[in-house]
């Protein structure tokens, strides 16, 4: 199963990246995350808390290319695993394409898929929250033509 969201943000990739890698600031702008413990950087294991969920997610950050992409992975390979990628594509000096995609796999997936929430609305909220905050920062700093 794969869930994907894509949005164009009227802000530089560096602004978007700054939001995506500021663990302490996430709850301020992101309605889908109530807290992240740890630092969002290569090789780090995070503790992520989401509203309404009675568990803590512990993804490991990998594949980091600053202001371009990263991946968060959680679970056991071949058993049940989630891999979430974040990709930023600068479009000129004032716009950034953002794609977030999560792929679930493993032998246990068929058994647990009915217990998973509908990620579509969650991903849409995440992308819209990111867009709103990045564009607010860009307007405030004069880093956009909007």
Model-identified regions with their sequence ranges:
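Conserved short-loop catalytic and cofactor-binding motifs
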Residues: 4, 49, 114, 118
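Hydrophobic-ligand binding "helix-grip"
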Residues: 37, 49-97, 103-108, 132, ...
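Secreted/surface-exposed cysteine- and glycine-rich disulfide frameworks
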Residues: 43-46
């Amino acid at each position: 199963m794969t869930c994907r969201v894509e949005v164009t943000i009227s802000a530089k990739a560096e602004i978007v990246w700054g939001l995506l890698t500021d663990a302490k600031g996430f709850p301020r702008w992101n309605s889908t995350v109530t807290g992240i413990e740890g630092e969002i950087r290569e090789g780090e294991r995070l503790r992520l808390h989401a509203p309404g969920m009675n568990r803590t997610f512990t993804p490991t950050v990998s594949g980091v290319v600053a202001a371009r992409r990263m991946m968060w992975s959680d679970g056991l390979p071949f058993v049940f695993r989630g891999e979430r990628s974040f990709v930023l594509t600068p479009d000129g000096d004032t716009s950034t394409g953002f794609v977030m995609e999560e792929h679930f796999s493993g032998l246990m997936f068929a058994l647990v898929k009915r217990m998973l929430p509908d990620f579509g609305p969650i991903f849409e909220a995440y992308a819209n929250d990111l867009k709103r905050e990045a564009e607010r920062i860009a307007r405030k700093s004069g880093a956009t033509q909007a």
